[in-house]
C-alpha cells in the first residue's frame, strides 16, 4: 500500500503494467487516457474488467495504470494481472476467488525465438530433392 493506493504489478508477454487502485467511483485511466480511449477493441476492455466484475468491485475503485511494452492484447492481459494483484493487496480474502478464475497465475507463454536457418521460429526453408 502506497499512501491510500493499493498497488499491483502485472505482466503478459513483453508488456508490464503498474496498477494503482483506491476507493472511488469506477474511473479507469490507462497512461493518462480513459480506458475506452486507450483500448480500441471491445475484447481488451472485457479482459481488463474481468477481475472487477468477478469480485463485484466494478464501480468501487478508481484505477490508475501505467503500461509499457507489447501490443494491445498483451497490455490488456498485463493490466488484468496487475488489477488482480492490487485487489489482493486491498483484500487478501479475494485471492481464492480470483485464483479459481485463473487471474492470479501469470501467463508464462512468451514468443519463441527465431532459429538460424529457419524462416521463423519453426518454419523451415523449403526442402528441394534435386
From Swiss-Prot:
PROSITE patterns: RIBOSOMAL_S9
GO molecular function: RNA binding; structural constituent of ribosome
Protein's GO biological process: translation
InterPro entries for this protein: Ribosomal_Su5_D2-typ_SF, Ribosomal_uS9, Ribosomal_uS9_bac/plastid, Ribosomal_uS9_CS, Ribsml_uS5_D2-typ_fold_subgr
Highest taxon listed in the record's lineage: Bacteria
Positions of transmembrane segments: none
Keywords for this protein: Ribonucleoprotein, Ribosomal protein
Record-stated family: Belongs to the universal ribosomal protein uS9 family.
Record's protein name: Small ribosomal subunit protein uS9
Organism, scientific name: Paraburkholderia xenovorans (strain LB400)
Gene: rpsI
Amino acid at each position: 500500500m502506497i499512501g491510500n493506493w493499493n498497488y499491483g504489478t502485472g505482466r503478459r508477454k513483453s508488456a508490464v503494467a503498474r496498477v494503482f487502485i483506491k476507493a472511488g467511483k469506477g474511473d479507469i485511466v490507462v497512461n493518462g487516457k480513459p480506458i475506452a480511449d486507450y483500448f480500441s477493441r471491445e475484447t481488451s476492455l472485457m479482459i481488463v474488467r474481468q477481475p472487477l466484475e468477478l469480485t463485484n468491485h466494478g464501480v468501487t475503485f478508481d484505477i490508475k495504470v501505467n503500461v509499457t511494452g507489447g501490443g494491445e492484447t498483451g497490455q490488456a492481459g498485463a493490466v488484468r494481472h496487475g488489477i488482480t494483484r492490487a485487489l489482493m493487496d486491498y483484500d487478501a480474502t479475494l485471492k481464492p476467488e480470483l485464483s479459481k478464475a485463473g487471474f492470479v497465475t501469470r501467463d508464462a507463454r512468451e514468443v519463441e525465438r527465431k532459429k538460424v536457418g529457419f524462416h521463423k521460429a519453426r518454419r523451415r526453408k523449403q526442402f528441394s530433392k534435386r
